[in-house]
């Protein structure tokens, strides 16, 4: 089984060093996506322009994509909403992740980058099954994580890992 990496960070220079592709997340939406070098050189949104200006981008870090295109992770219209009102009387939904779609192929590294509070951690928790979703789908190794049984999900989880930014701070 080939590997792929999903890097979730607010540090654009680190994403540039490790990733082939990038998706810029803001208020739960992917607002810009593509080849990392193209996105960095020609940012289309204000958020991306600010991220590029805020950090030093390391040259010579572009990764070569492996020719074999096995899809390992497919996320389609994923939604993670939190009810922050007094349910059921006054529902107000915070759309932490809203209609997020991307694919990750064998040999690729995709960076999810955005400012604090934009939905990166919520997306990570949803992808690992630690947070329920409000809609959309997550396919990992061709299996829909929201519809498979507990035993199959447990077997798939051996291939999923979170590496925290500062492991000692998580204890």
Language model feature labels by segment:
Residues 15-17:
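A short, surface-exposed alpha-helical micro-motif characterized by mixed small hydrophobic
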Residues 136-144, 156:
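Conserved ABC transporter NBD signature motif
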Residues 40-69:
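C-terminal boundary and immediately downstream tail of ABC-type ATPase nucleotide-binding domains
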Residues 113-114:
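The feature captures the beta-strand-to-loop junction immediately N-terminal to the Walker
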Residues 128:
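Helix-to-loop junction immediately C-terminal to a conserved catalytic motif
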Residues 33-34, 42:
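ABC ATPase "signature
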